[in-house]
Amino acid sequence: NEVKEYLAALQKKLVSIDYIITEDIPNIGLNMDQVTTFMDEQLEACKRYEDDKILTKTMINNYAKNNLLPAPEKKKYSKEHVLTLLFIYYFKNLLSINDIQSLLNPLTEHYFGNKAGFNKEDVYNEVLNLESTESEKLLKDLGKKYALSSETFRKFPENDQEFLQNFSFICLLSYD
């Protein structure tokens, strides 16, 4: 079954994801080419297709124009700029640009460049710490939903069952 193979590959990929830790982000200002290269290299495993672009200069400029990303200092992007771009990258698969802006603007106001207290790096690290336990839960949930969907449509014609079971699996994944 194609879906079962896909699910196994997805589980393998989820286990192998190596999220960017803040220590991997350079502590020096990067120019735009360095930022796009860094993001492409670090997030290569997240590409769906080999020729997909993780981040382009146009995207960075649009994020800055739409106040998602603070302007660079003397054309250099700081570690906090890169962290902001990471949040945008992860969120854009789930949220609209306006929703991302609503979420990130208060974060930027309170924590971008904050030298006296918590900063964006602290926020990123706190969120990243949640990842390992949540990934395990996600894998278990995927398996449970797949097993549940495999039990559906038993009374339907046999040649339709696999398609309908796959359909029910996708439906289970889309419930809020």
Locations of the language-model features?
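Basic helix-turn-helix/winged-helix DNA-binding cores
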Residues: 1-110
